[in-house]
Amino acid sequence: MPEPLPTAEVDRVLVVVAHPDDADFGAAGTTATWTRAGVEVTYLLCTYGDQGGFDDTPREQVPAIREAEQRAAAAAVGVSDVRFLTGYHDGSLDPTRELQRDIVRVMRQVRPRRVLTQSPERWWDRIGASHPDHLAAGEATIRALYPAARNPFAYPELLTDEGLEPWTVEEAWLMADERADHAVDITDTFDAKLAALRAHASQTAHLGDDLEERLHSWGRKVAEDAGMAPGRLAEVFRVIATG
């Protein structure tokens, strides 16, 4: 596997996901380690998660609820720049050229060295991780990252009309990928991850105290599989050099 860029050399990271809470389930502990090290992290949500939830809240109220929850969750891990795309809907996300263009726009605005997103590859043994929207967000992000973001002739209106210069992202990190091989120790940031996920009350309140145990169990298993010392907690990613 490629050796990831040292955190000390990464000034900005862009996280692109399909729904509110996706980044927090998959990478909140890692994100907190980055922000505590001085890395500027931006969240980009492709939808407002309007199909999520476990109660009878009117659907038209859900986007505002989930946006507020995501902003609170982001704050728990040190992220203040949270952006939402408009015009895309939970349950019907596709890696269209329009979605790719909108992600390229943010890549050129933020100019990150690293992008973290969802794996575009279906994981048959963990089908729950392969929600179609997750696959679409990951596919659109990878297409945006290479080659469009660095190509001045891709979406030329971004350069001519908006003045957004091409940008080369050097590294992609994929969540929920079957071939993930880079574990990050999140023992010291687990409480931040838990706080972030509790902030998504419309999605997690029904779990009660079981939420902490589930997260702890997942993190412990990942750490054990990565050969970390007993009692450690981790998140795992597939890292791809894209520079």
Regions found by a protein language model. Give the residues of each.
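Metal-dependent de-N-acetylase/amidase catalytic core
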Residues: 1-14, 95-243
